[in-house]
């Protein structure tokens, strides 16, 4: 665990509050500095690797907590944090401005951001080239029809153009696995189970990247031509990625070559909470209140395309122009909490089998002919 002081204060007798978060949660440092300037309370930030290791640390230290406030508990860890009573109920100031669909009845955790995780694709790779009126369509050079759902990942035409992050190594990859399970649940009549769909994906040519950053920023090349070496034009991202992709450009372009596939999206929520048994509950509450203030909420969007939990926060110009309001289905956090690690084991088993090069064993069918 790495401990760093996120802010500083010139006061002689500086009060401190301990904040536990993780590397994959974007922490708005300007908002923490403003909190210190207003209150005189210095925020000591401790960082874990991801949401799972962060909640595990809270569980191990529950009798003598290592922090007063926790930030970045996602939908996959919400049940464990609540069920183990690692956090205390608290109703922060400003909660009335939060999207009502994100609120929890037990008030143990406070929503601070939300992510609509979706498939993303190139626009230009699927555009028809202009053709003269006296020209016949050239069938071999006609571009692919644009993918519009998860089923494209098992389509032999689209699978070789897709890259997704590995859920064994990446949180965004884990969200992809959760979305895959939701689209193709096991033990459901008429639905092919997700392990079988995964096998078809891998055998059809879908690439698994070691991280989401590798998948998005390196392998996904929306503007690449088909003649270039193995371009990937279909990947896993979010409804916010078209806006994120122009964040560091000196000027906003007229358009961006990234489209969101508004089908099969899932909504992931990031929460904050007051750590149970904290010796400084009052100041912990003040820090948690600050997470819903406008500056923190305005700065909470991250490289994954997350958005504020509040509904009244002004959008950036990039989001206004390129952001997509996707129809993302909320996760059943109570159901998923105890079983997503089992899905990871199944993913590993299926991917290892495909890597081995072994062909799937066909089922043995026995036919009994009735006697005359």
What is each stretch, according to the model?
Residues 65-70, 88-124, 151, 161-167:
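A structural signal for short loop-to-beta-strand junctions that line the ligand-binding cleft
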Residues 120-125, 181-182, 268-283, 299-303:
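A bilobed periplasmic-binding-protein/Venus flytrap-type ligand-binding module shared by bacterial periplasmic
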Residues 10-80, 357-369:
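Early extracytoplasmic/lumenal segment of secretory-pathway proteins
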Residues 87-94, 107-111, 151-154, 247-266, ...:
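Short beta-strand->loop
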Residues 97-101, 115, 195-204, 209-211, ...:
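Periplasmic-binding protein-like
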Residues 275-332:
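Mature extracytoplasmic/periplasmic domains
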Residues 328-372:
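Conserved C-terminal helix/tail region of periplasmic/extracytoplasmic solute-binding proteins
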């Amino acid at each position: 665990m790495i401990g760093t002081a996120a802010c500083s204060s010139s006061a002689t007798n500086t009060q401190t509050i301990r904040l536990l978060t993780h590397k994959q949660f974007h922490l708005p440092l300007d908002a923490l500095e403003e909190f210190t300037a207003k209150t005189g309370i210095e925020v000591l930030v401790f960082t874990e690797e991801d949401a799972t290791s962060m909640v595990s640390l809270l569980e191990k230290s529950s009798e003598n907590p290592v922090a007063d406030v926790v930030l970045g508990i996602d939908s996959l860890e919400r049940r464990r944090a609540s069920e183990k009573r690692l956090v205390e109920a608290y109703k922060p100031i400003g909660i009335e401005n939060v999207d009502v669909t994100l609120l929890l009845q037990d008030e143990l955790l406070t929503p601070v951001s939300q992510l609509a995780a979706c498939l993303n694709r190139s626009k230009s790779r699927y555009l028809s080239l202009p053709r003269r009126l006296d020209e016949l369509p050239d069938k071999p050079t006609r571009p692919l029809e644009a993918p519009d759902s998860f089923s494209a990942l098992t389509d032999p035409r689209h699978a070789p153009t897709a890259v997704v992050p590995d859920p064994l190594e990446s949180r965004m990859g884990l969200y992809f696995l959760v979305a895959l399970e939701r689209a193709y649940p096991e033990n459901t009549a008429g639905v092919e189970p997700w392990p079988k769909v995964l096998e078809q994906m891998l055998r059809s040519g879908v690439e698994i990247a070691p991280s989401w950053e590798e998948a998005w920023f390196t392998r996904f090349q929306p503007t690449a031509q088909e003649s270039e070496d193995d371009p990937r034009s279909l990947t896993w991202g979010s409804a916010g990625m078209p806006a994120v992709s122009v964040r560091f450009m000196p000027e906003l372009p007229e358009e961006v070559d990234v489209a969101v596939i508004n089908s099969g999206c899932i909504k992931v929520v990031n929460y904050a909470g007051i750590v149970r048994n904290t010796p400084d509950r009052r100041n912990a509450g003040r820090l948690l209140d600050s997470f819903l203030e406008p500056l923190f909420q305005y700065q909470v969007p991250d490289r994954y395309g997350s958005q504020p939990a509040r509904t009244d926060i002004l959008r950036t110009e990039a989001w206004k122009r390129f952001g997509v309001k996707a129809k993302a289905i909320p996760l059943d956090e109570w159901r998923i909490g105890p079983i997503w690690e089992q899905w990871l084991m199944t993913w590993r088993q299926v991917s290892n089998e495909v890597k081995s090069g072994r062909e799937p064993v066909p089922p043995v069918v026995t036919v009994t002919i009735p006697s005359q």
